[in-house]
A protein has these predicted regions:
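Cation-handling catalytic/transport regions enriched in His/Asp/Glu
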Residues: 1-170
């Protein structure tokens, strides 16, 4: 959420209504997620993750554990997000006459049709409590989280190809 706050604070636009979290859903999660990503970069983490009494930088072995924990189970997390994004799309493609009464059967069929009906990796959010898709402004736009991860990866590659985190690179 800190990335959303930064996005809002640093927006310098003619029409504030179209700044911060009021940008298109395809982009809205990028500032938030890219800032979360930077927070765990070793070069960044060493600037703020210091011992509260001595000021010593985070030890390399602890940094390795933090990185390993962040990378752990990424496939599972991606599958959860993907299944939720697919359900979101399927619900929002229905006409009023097609809305089913059996929500669980609809979910099962929708996930099977998409090839992601794998019980050990269920959707992150089930329809009955999926507030992003029905009340959170993400109607048919939950995929924005996955798209933001792609944009994050592109950002990382750009920085790696252009000399890393430098003042010149922003």
């Amino acid at each position: 959420e800190f990335g959303h706050a930064l996005h809002g604070m640093f927006s310098n636009v003619k029409y504030p209504r179209f700044a911060g979290t009021s940008v298109p859903r395809d982009f809205v999660e990028y500032p938030s997620q890219v800032n979360e990503m930077w927070a765990l970069w070793p070069e960044v983490l060493q600037n703020y993750a210091k011992h509260y009494q001595t000021g010593a930088a985070i030890p390399a072995e602890l940094l390795a554990k933090v990185t390993a924990a962040d990378n752990f189970n990424q496939g599972y997390k991606t599958t959860e997000y993907l299944a939720s994004a697919l359900l979101d799309q399927r619900w929002h493609q229905l006409t009023p006459a097609q809305i089913p009464t059996d929500v669980l059967a609809f979910e099962k069929a929708a996930l099977a049709d998409a090839g992601v009906d794998f019980a050990p990796a269920p959707p992150r959010y089930r329809t009955t409590y999926f507030s992003h898709a029905f009340a959170g402004g993400y109607s048919a736009g939950y995929y924005a989280y996955l798209w933001s991860e792609k944009l994050d990866a592109d950002t990382v590659e750009w920085f790696k190809e252009n000399g890393g985190l430098t003042r010149k690179n922003g």
